[in-house]
Curated annotation (Swiss-Prot):
It comes from the Eukaryota. This is Ankyrin repeat protein SKIP35. ANK repeats lie at residues 292-322, 323-353, 356-384, 385-414, 416-442, 445-478. The keyword Ribonucleoprotein does not apply. InterPro entries: Ankyrin_rpt-contain_sf, SKIP35. Interacts with SKP1A/ASK1. Keywords: ANK repeat, Repeat. It comes from Arabidopsis thaliana (Mouse-ear cress).
């Protein structure tokens, strides 16, 4: 699984958001053109700009106009020209400073529950500012706590729409993001100021895991961070107004019901002015913050009150036409957002949607998200272990390999994982898997294992050498025989040439015979020097143990350096011949099982020098 398997596209505005903690000072809108990083499966989080809000004007309209709007108009089932016609008197364009001031006043009126003042401010707004006020009013939904507050804010939203607000896409996208941040912050024990630091660090880590141009990633990261900081400021502002200081209080079931009812009312008013794409992008925006905060969630967050709001929000977005549940599910799995994975599993189940739990398991295992892997297997019923296990073995990710093995793998899965580790020269993983593959399976597939490991080795046969030295068949005669069989397979084109050459040179019967000849030649050369050497220091004058050490210490060191239970055939041949010479040629050609005994004989002769 490649790194770029899941990578989100993040679209934000170029607008610099003010530092004041007024929720009215930031908005979002969709952008057609986006900055895209390398990636495939991931979802897109689309945010954007628009100028901040708000202003103040002496001009106004009859306050009874909005109250007199019919249900037909509120639900936008009549002619859009009706709304436009009724608001002709409001078409005066407010400048930026006026919009900002009006927005601040409106925000203050909403948080202080001064509905009368808020209604008067609505009448002063121009069309652009009305869209801004719609965002502010809708954002306030997630902080409702009483029935009068519900009636007040829903009444304001209706009036804002009646007066001409029409940017439902931006309002939905923005408030979905904010609602997600509210739910996430309710699960945390640290302060909001600490949350900003945690969020920034997590965002940086997430972008580093994505492929793409570094400059574009930095720009996207800065924009996402600004938007998230705005959301946290908005949460902090409302929390302080509710007397919670720098922390977010938990909502009761009754409060959550009010909040979701208010959002549902807004969706009903928007009607068909929200497209399936709008719901999809809002779903994406709601999931995005949860991946940033996932490492800080309390265990069981997905089944607690903090997650109830986001579950209800996501459910309504799916009902509206969001079709990216699986994409967000895969992304959450990749980033180890276990609690979000749980929420999305529940959403999929309730709405009879298919999510690819096996592919998600592959993503989670690739990035070593053990907690998410456990959730996908136990709660999502993921069963496809083979692919993730083999990829983990190829990468040498011992933690993931051990997790799969402990969960229970079939014999063939273990065998294939061993082959994958061997071909990638992941000796540590291969050593862990080897004793767990049943011997009958290894025996039946021994030739195929070595051939496959050699074929995918990329030029290094360290893994193949490890298997042979480890006596992977548990029978030295059988292990040597398998290696010799492959070395002799001159007509088998499926055997990689480098593997065949390696086995012929080191692990075949001919290699054993060559080793014996080499050792014999070394002995004869040594004897020639001993008897006919013209050096001033004659080897013949040295003590016998020292002469043995000079002749055979290099071979002994080479044998000791060779790790594993078996020596290569070539080295074994040299050892056999050396012992025969030391024993006065009285030793017959030994069985392979006696190789270690021969090492003991050689060691005995060498250590005599210390007696």
């Amino acid at each position: 699984m490649e790194k770029e398997g899941v990578c989100d596209t993040i679209n934000l505005s170029d607008q610099m958001y003010p530092d004041e903690p007024f929720c009215s000072e930031m908005k979002t809108e969709t952008i057609a053109s986006s900055q895209k990083f390398e990636g495939g499966e991931g979802s897109k989080v689309v945010f954007s700009r628009e100028a901040p809000l708000i202003g103040k004007d002496s001009a106004g309209t009859n306050s009874g106009e909005c109250c007199g709007c019919s249900a037909k108009k509120l639900n936008f089932k009549g002619d859009d020209d009706l709304v436009e016609k009724e608001n002709i008197e409001q078409q005066k364009k407010l400048n930026r400073q006026e919009r900002i001031e009006l927005g601040r006043l409106f925000q203050g009126a909403v948080t202080s529950l001064d509905w009368e003042l808020a209604e008067r401010l609505i009448q002063l707004a121009d069309p652009q500012t009305l869209n801004d006020l719609l965002c502010v009013g809708l954002d306030s939904v997630w902080f409702l706590s009483t029935k009068p507050e519900f009636q007040g804010i829903t009444g304001l939203i209706k009036k804002i729409i009646c007066h001409g607000a029409h940017d439902f896409t931006r309002a939905t996208l923005r408030t979905s993001f904010l609602a997600s941040c509210v739910s996430a912050c309710q699960s945390r024990t640290m302060s909001l100021s600490d949350t900003v630091t945690v969020m920034a660090q997590r965002l940086h880590e997430r972008l580093q895991e994505c492929n793409g141009d570094e400059i574009l990633k930095a720009e996207a990261g800065a924009k996402v961070q600004k938007f998230t900081e705005w959301a946290l400021k908005c949460i902090g502002f409302h929390s302080r107004c509710q007397g919670a200081k720098d922390r977010v209080s938990q909502n009761s079931a009754a409060e959550i019901e009010l909040q979701l009812s208010a959002f549902k009312m807004f969706l009903d008013l928007a009607g068909n002015h929200l497209s399936g794409r709008d719901f999809t992008e809002a779903f994406d925006a709601a999931c995005f913050p949860l991946t940033l905060f996932s490492n800080s969630f309390d265990p069981g967050w997905a089944s607690g009150m903090s997650a109830t709001v986001i579950q209800g929000l996501l459910g309504m977005l799916v009902e509206g036409g969001a079709d990216n549940v699986n994409q967000c599910f895969l992304e959450a799995s990749r980033f180890g957002s276990t609690e979000l994975v749980r929420v999305l599993l529940q959403i999929a189940q309730r709405n009879s949607l298919d999510v690819d739990v096996d592919l998600a398991l592959g993503f989670a295992s690739h990035y070593c998200k053990i907690g998410t892997m456990k959730c996908l297997v136990e709660e999502g019923n993921a069963i496809a272990f083979l692919g993730p296990l083999m990829r983990a073995a190829e990468r040498g990710c011992m933690q993931v390999v051990q997790w799969f093995v402990k969960r229970g793998c079939r014999d063939m899965e273990l065998c294939l994982a061993l082959t994958a580790a061997t071909s990638s020269c992941q000796v540590e993983v291969a050593a862990y898997l080897l004793p767990r593959v049943p011997p009958p399976v290894l025996t039946a597939l021994s030739i195929e294992i070595l051939k496959a490991a050699g074929e995918r080795s990329g030029g290094s046969l360290q893994g193949v050498e490890f298997l042979l030295k480890s006596d992977f068949l548990g029978d030295s005669t059988a292990t040597y025989s398998v290696a010799d069989s492959i070395a002799r397979s001159s007509e088998d084109e499926s055997v990689p040439s480098d593997l065949k050459s390696f086995l012929q040179e080191h692990w075949s019967e001919s290699a054993f015979e060559k080793g014996m000849r080499e050792s014999h030649d070394d002995f004869m050369n040594f004897m020639r020097v001993l008897k006919k050497g013209e050096s001033a220091i004659s080897l013949r004058d040295l003590p016998a143990p020292l002469r043995v050490a000079i002749a055979y210490m290099p071979l002994y060191r080479e044998c000791m350096k060779a790790d594993g239970r078996l020596l290569s055939q070539r080295l074994r041949g040299q050892l056999v011949e050396a012992v025969r010479q030391l024993q006065g040629c009285a030793v017959a050609v030994v069985e392979v099982s006696q190789t270690r005994n021969l090492m003991a004989v050689l060691e005995h002769h060498l250590t005599a020098i210390f007696d």
